[in-house]
């Protein structure tokens, strides 16, 4: 298993952007250790950004990475609101179109990798375009 940054290593001494980049890099390493292949990071399309795009076999996986210091207020996973899900779906739709694909032609899913303190939770298929 990939080494997870210790509490404070990413979030206290670094800027918010640097901390986000560090957690996304940790997420990428962790997912690669689970057999997923890296496709892209920080993919920006009009109206949104996808943290990681990975491949799990033939499935394209859009990954939202979240970090919270503690589980108060629901922890990291709870911060992926319905509004955020819609933005991710929209961004993925645009990215797929640039790849000459769509939700109808490409097997894909949306995962959330949530770091709460030093704990990792991997929510496979956390939501979809039918949610």
From Swiss-Prot:
InterPro entries, alphabetized: Restrct_endonuc-II-like, tRNA_endonuc-like_dom_sf, UPF0102_YraN-like
Gene3D superfamilies according to UniProt: 3.40.1350.10
Gene Ontology terms for molecular function: nucleic acid binding
Domain of life the protein comes from: Bacteria
PANTHER family xref list: UPF0102 PROTEIN YRAN
Sequence similarity: Belongs to the UPF0102 family.
Protein name: UPF0102 protein YraN
């Amino acid at each position: 298993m990939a080494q997870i940054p210790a509490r404070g290593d990413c979030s206290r001494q670094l800027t918010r952007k640097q901390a986000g980049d560090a957690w996304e890099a940790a997420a990428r390493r962790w997912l690669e250790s689970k057999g997923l292949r890296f496709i892209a990071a920080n993919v920006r399309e009009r109206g949104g950004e996808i943290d990681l795009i990975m491949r799990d076999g033939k499935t394209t996986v859009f990954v939202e990475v979240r970090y919270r210091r503690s589980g108060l207020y629901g922890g990291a996973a709870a911060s992926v609101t319905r509004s955020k899900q819609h933005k991710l779906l929209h961004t993925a739709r645009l990215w797929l179109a640039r790849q000459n694909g769509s939700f109808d032609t490409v097997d894909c899913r949306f995962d959330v990798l949530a770091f709460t303190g030093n704990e990792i939770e991997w929510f496979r298929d956390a939501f979809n375009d039918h949610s």
